[in-house]
Design a protein with these regions (language model features):
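Canonical positions in the second alpha-helix
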Residues: 25-26, 57-58, 91-92, 125-126, ...
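Structural marker of alpha-solenoid helical repeat scaffolds
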Residues: 28-29, 61, 94-95, 129, ...
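Residue-level recognition of tetratricopeptide repeat
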Residues: 31-32, 65, 99, 133, ...
Length: 414
């Protein structure tokens, strides 16, 4: 390991020219085992070209060592040198001990370029040679997972888990949970998330588990996992929204608002946080707070339709007519129009006794709300008040079609 320390320092400094010279000298002076170790180190630090140079040197010295060809092929694939990789793998004979691994490398390549049937064929060929090899079964499971065959993938991984197979760097319980979750089988995923969390309460696993519990409406448990997540990783931003939604489902709106404002404190540029905070504030009856949150959401995205609609509806409901009109004018300056605001603006101008503007927006709204009986009724009485009887007659005829059981519309025509 001592011989690797100078390489680590040079790689951390990013001095490629010096590194090349050191690699050349190492290939002349040191033994093959240490050279192979250097190739691993270079790969680990991302110096792929230098790792290839080292392995090519070893492959020249030991052409019968097929593992070197596989290592080279994998590095060539990282550099998108598919032809070089395929040529290297084609030199491995079927009777070689390394042939199953070569097939697995080919399967990875075909999976990467989307030729899933070819990839599966290569894996099956390798399994036929080594039927008890867990790594090959796992590779097949991953392929099934990627191609959306979730139940098959989960069953295969469960068999691996039951056989006590251990794969370096793989938590089979977590993998099974992820597969079931991807297939929306959250009930089946939950026991495996629980197993995975007993080994390590990693932030991503806590989030995934929290989401699974949320999906099956076990909100208290979801909140427990999400609170734990945010305690150990306050910068796991998506945890705040899910926690707030969880509290909202429990009708703990104060806690929901607290969770989402914590999220805003961590990420003040996430418009969805402000929208959610606005909605929860409305549920709590805090109109002014809701207005502030919604205004912030729109400031971040002037075309954020959900926030615009809710704020417009709030202004209309509270008869904050001037605020509604100001919002519309501000959006118009941004070259953004939202037709769902037209009925609200018509009512606002009518309340302000600005009848010409009200009529203008009623007409604009009419084109898209001809089947909205509530809007048409308002428009009808506005037209009658304004003396526009012919236009009112047209609206009455439409209301008769929409609400034939309402005698009021027929009485008006008599």
């Amino acid at each position: 390991m001592e011989k690797m320390i100078p390489f680590i320092r040079v790689m951390e400094d990013g001095d490629i020219e010096k590194l090349d010279g050191m690699v050349d000298a190492f290939l002349l002076e040191e033994n093959p085992d240490e050279q192979y170790g250097l190739a691993d180190l270079l790969t680990e630090y991302g110096f792929i070209q230098e790792a290839i140079k080292t392995l090519e040197h070893l492959n020249f010295l030991f052409p019968e060592e097929d593992q070197l060809k596989i290592d080279l092929a994998q590095l060539f694939l990282e550099l998108n040198k598919e032809d070089d990789a395929l040529e290297m793998l084609s030199n491995i004979e079927k009777n070689s001990e390394s042939y199953p691994q070569a097939l697995l490398t080919l399967a990875d390549y075909y999976q990467m370029i989307g030729l899933y049937e070819v990839a599966e064929h290569k894996i099956e060929e390798a399994i036929a040679l080594l039927p008890g090899e867990p790594l090959l079964q796992y590779a097949k499971g991953e392929l099934l997972f990627e191609t959306g065959r979730y139940l098959e993938a989960a069953r295969l991984m469960e068999d691996l888990l039951a056989s006590k197979s251990e794969l370096q760097g793989v938590d089979l319980s977590l993998k099974i949970a992820e597969i079931y979750s991807a297939g929306a089988a959250y009930e089946e995923a939950i026991p495996y998330y629980t197993e995975a969390l007993q080994k390590e309460a990693a932030p991503e696993v806590l989030f995934q588990a929290g989401y699974a519990f949320f999906q099956v409406r076990q909100y208290e448990t979801a909140a427990k996992h999400l609170n734990h997540l945010l305690e150990i990783d306050p910068d796991f931003f998506s945890g705040y929204m899910l926690l707030a939604e969880t509290y909202a489902m429990l009708e703990k709106n104060e806690e929901a608002l607290s969770a989402i404002t914590d999220g805003i404190a961590r990420d003040e540029f996430e418009k969805e946080y402000y929208l959610f905070a606005g909605k929860i504030s409305l549920k709590l009856g805090r109109v002014k707070e809701a207005e502030g949150f919604l205004q912030e959401a729109i400031a971040l995205d002037p075309e954020y339709m959900d926030a615009i609609y809710i704020l417009s509806s709030l202004f209309s409901q509270e008869e904050m007519d001037e605020e509604l009109i100001d919002l519309y004018e501000t959006l118009k300056q941004e070259q953004f129009e939202m037709s769902s605001m037209y009925p609200l603006l018509a009512s606002a101008y009518e309340r302000l006794e600005m009848y010409e503007k009200a009529y203008e927006f009623y007409k604009l709204a009419y084109t898209e709300h001809k089947e909205d009986a509530a809007f048409l009724e308002k428009y009808l009485y506005f037209l009658l008040e304004d003396g526009k009887r012919e236009e009112a007659r047209e609206i009455i005829l439409i209301l008769q079609e929409l609400q034939p059981e309402n005698s009021e519309w027929f009485d008006m025509m008599e």
